[in-house]
Structure formats: C-alpha cells, structure tokens
Curated annotation (Swiss-Prot):
Record's protein name: SRA stem-loop-interacting RNA-binding protein, mitochondrial
Modification sites for Phosphoserine: 105
One GO MF term attached to the UniProt entry: RNA binding
Entry superkingdom: Eukaryota
SMART domains referenced in this protein's UniProt entry, alphabetically: RRM
Compartments reported by the entry: Mitochondrion; Nucleus
KW Protein biosynthesis (keyword) present: no
Residue segments, region Disordered: 92-111
Function, in words: RNA-binding protein that acts as a nuclear receptor corepressor. Probably acts by binding the SRA RNA, and repressing the SRA-mediated nuclear receptor coactivation. Binds the STR7 loop of SRA RNA. Also able to repress glucocorticoid (GR), androgen (AR), thyroid (TR) and VDR-mediated transactivation.
Matches recorded under Gene3D superfamilies: 3.30.70.330
Disulphides: none
Keywords per UniProt: Mitochondrion, Nucleus, Phosphoprotein, Repressor, RNA-binding, Transcription, Transcription regulation, Transit peptide
Amino acid sequence: MAASAARGAMALRTNIGRPVAFVRKIPWTAASSELREHFAQFGHVRKCTVPFDKETGFHKGMGWIHFSSEEELHNALQQENHVIDGVKLHVQPQRPKALQGDQTSDEEKDF
C-alpha cells in the first residue's frame, strides 16, 4: 500500500491542475453512470468519459474521471480496490500527454 501511495503522490505532483484519473479494466457490462456513481464517493465528478468502439458498439474498457480537486483525486487513488460488477478496476492518475513536434515543456531537464 505504501508503494502505491508513493506512486500516487508522485504522480499528483506531476499533474498539478489536472485532477484526472485514468481507469482501465472497466467491465463491458458497466455504464458510464455506474463509473460516475462509484467515483462520486471520493468527491465531485466533473466529467466521466468512456470512449466507445464504433464497430462493436461497446466501450473500450477504459475511461477518464475528472475530479474538481487534487484532493478528490488523491482520495480515489488511496482506495485499494475499486470494484464494479465484480471486476477490479485499475485506477491511476492521468499522465500528461507526450510532447510532439514543435511543442515544448517548461519542465527543467537534467542533461
């Protein structure tokens, strides 16, 4: 538990201003409303996004939970087991997108 808490805390520092959890292993039987309801116990869910596959009509088994604050995200990350429809979800902080092309970062680099 301490290792996962440390990872969560470190990830929170890198995602300041972006209180978003990335959720994997969402069972195909679960609706986005169930996901929203589950994560609402940790704080206000501003947005719940679960992308669908246009060919199959089913969601892709992953999604994003946008919280109102870093504290709410932290509360969700502290929970060891997130279970919906009997399936344990994999929850982690959303990582910043990789920089592409001409994009730059204001993050200091060690060379």
